A protein has these predicted regions:
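Tandem CBS (Bateman) regulatory domains
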Residues: 1-14, 54-90, 103-107, 127-143
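Residue-level recognition of oxygen-bearing side chains
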Residues: 6, 23, 98, 121, ...
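A glycine-centered beta-loop-beta connector
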Residues: 31, 39-55, 106, 114-130
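Short, functional N-terminal and low-complexity linear motifs
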Residues: 25-29, 49-53, 67-73, 98-101
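Short, flexible active-site loop motifs that bind/organize anionic cofactors or intermediates
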Residues: 14-17, 47, 92, 121-122
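The conserved cystathionine-beta-synthase
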Residues: 18-35, 41-43, 83-86, 92-110, ...
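Short, charged/polar low-complexity linear motifs in solvent-exposed/disordered segments
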Residues: 36-37, 43-45, 66-69, 111-112, ...
Length: 143
C-alpha cells in the first residue's frame, strides 16, 4: 500500500531551524513556541550541520544537585551554544526516499525524525508524527 510513497509527500517543508551559534536558551524557547522536539542546525548557506533535540537541551540543563547559585547557573546557561551540544553526524534521507525506508531507519536507530536533504541543502524533515498522519489518513480514505 505504501511501496510507492516517498518522503517528499509527507515531510514538513521549510522546517524551523537554528544556527550553530544560537544560544541553547534560544533553541529551547523556539522549540516551545513552535511545538517541535527537534531543530535541524543549518549553516549560513542552509546546509545541514547537525540536529538538536529537546533531550539534548534537557541533558545540558543544570542539575538540581549543583552548588552554583541561580545567577551563576543562568550566566553559564546563557553562554552555551547549540554547536556545543548538537549531534553532528546526522542520519538523513532524500525527498525520493521511500517512506517505508525512512520509517525503518527511525525504528532501527531509535530516532523520531530525519532531516530531508536534497543537493546538500535542507529540504524538510520527516518525523514519526508524519508517518502516523499518513497511516491515519490512509485508513480514513479506505473506509
Amino acid at each position: 500500500m505504501f511501496e510507492n510513497v516517498t518522503v517528499k509527500e509527507w515531510m514538513t517543508k521549510n522546517p524551523v531551524t537554528v544556527t550553530p551559534s544560537a544560544r541553547i536558551s534560544e533553541a529551547h524557547q523556539l522549540m516551545k513556541e513552535k511545538a517541535v522536539r527537534r531543530l535541524p542546525v543549518v549553516s549560513a548557506d542552509h546546509s545541514l550541520v547537525g540536529i538538536i533535540t529537546i533531550g539534548d537541551v534537557r541533558e545540558a540543563s543544570p542539575s538540581d544537585a549543583t552548588t552554583l547559585s541561580i545567577w551563576e547557573l543562568n550566566y553559564l546557561w546563557a553562554q552555551l551554544t547549540v554547536e556545543k551540544i548538537m549531534t553532528r553526524h546526522v542520519r538523513t534521507v532524500t525527498p525520493d526516499t521511500p517512506i517505508l525506508d525512512a520509517a525503518q531507519m527511525m525504528l532501527e536507530y531509535k530516532i523520531s525524525g530525519l532531516p530531508v536533504v536534497d543537493g546538500g541543502q535542507l529540504a524538510g524533515i520527516v518525523t514519526e508524527s508524519d508517518i502516523f498522519r499518513m497511516l491515519v489518513r490512509s485508513r480514513v480514505s479506505t473506509k
